[in-house]
């Protein structure tokens, strides 16, 4: 009698550089079927099969913590070498050239463009806090299987504008359209909190897992 081999859960390296909700992210990644290794040692990055970059707080402080931990160069090298990378919340914003939150502070520059701040308006509170819809654009593997009624949970004042060179992901409207999730080659990201977004967040993380271990 033949047996079907059990596929091992793909491993991801979750970066703990002092500016992200690592514990919640780790639990969510594990629920989505991944083996999670948490590290505060940048020397682990070159050996990682996949990277997850969380982030919360002020862009300057997050970027300074990232650089102080020695992650800047190794993560750039890994991303440019094609290692799958998932940025979450401010971890998504770090992929770009910089942010209006911290003029003059460079991001990783893996995708061209500047992160912008929501302008205050009578119909819009800043930060955006709560649920909002995801509208799929192009063919992002992160969004596969999600229907037109997909909602995710956001807490943010800064956003990635739709005029950056991205074609695949999800766009959300908060008085201005912005990329709420994206895929570009080996780079993937979500501005919302997958761990707080219920079945939609879990599905997005499971889709990232499938990119690491396709059937």
Swiss-Prot record:
PANTHER family named in the record: IMIDAZOLE GLYCEROL PHOSPHATE SYNTHASE SUBUNIT HISH (PTHR42701:SF1)
CDD domains found in the cross-reference section: GATase1_IGP_Synthase
A GO BP entry: L-histidine biosynthetic process
Principal subcellular localization: cytoplasm
EC number: 4.3.2.10, 3.5.1.2
Keyword Lyase attributed: yes
Gene label: hisH
Recorded metabolic or biological pathway in which this protein acts: Amino-acid biosynthesis; L-histidine biosynthesis; L-histidine from 5-phospho-alpha-D-ribose 1-diphosphate: step 5/9
Protein name: Imidazole glycerol phosphate synthase subunit HisH
Species, as recorded: Deinococcus radiodurans (strain ATCC 13939 / DSM 20539 / JCM 16871 / CCUG 27074 / LMG 4051 / NBRC 15346 / NCIMB 9279 / VKM B-1422 / R1)
MF term (GO), any: glutaminase activity
Gene Ontology cellular component list: cytoplasm
